[in-house]
Amino acid sequence: MNKLEQEASNWMKERYKDMKLQDYQEKAAEFAIYPNTHAITYPALGLAGEAGEVANKVKKFIRDGADRESFEVKKTEIAAEIGDVLWYCAALANDLGFELSALAAANLNKLQGRKDRGKIS
């Protein structure tokens, strides 16, 4: 990451450090520019594509290995793809009428139930 990118990254971290999922979902909706006839389908396909990009970056990291400096670069690239995954999750949740915070809470509840039943350790 060059100096300008680092400064921009630090600015963004400071500006949004206390952001809640609901705030993110509302702000992300401003960028959901696709035909309403493709609501649900468009973000679902985008989510699959971006998740694939995360997997591909991790695969290349495993294949190529990395020294400490390139590890930080690859980590930043993976983080950017995770951000894209988050955007598509927010768009899909909006199109389905769900709040990300409610989905996150329901997911944690489900995971806790699995842990309590000894299904995950």
Language-model features: where?
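Flexible "arm" and connector segments at domain edges
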Residues: 1-121
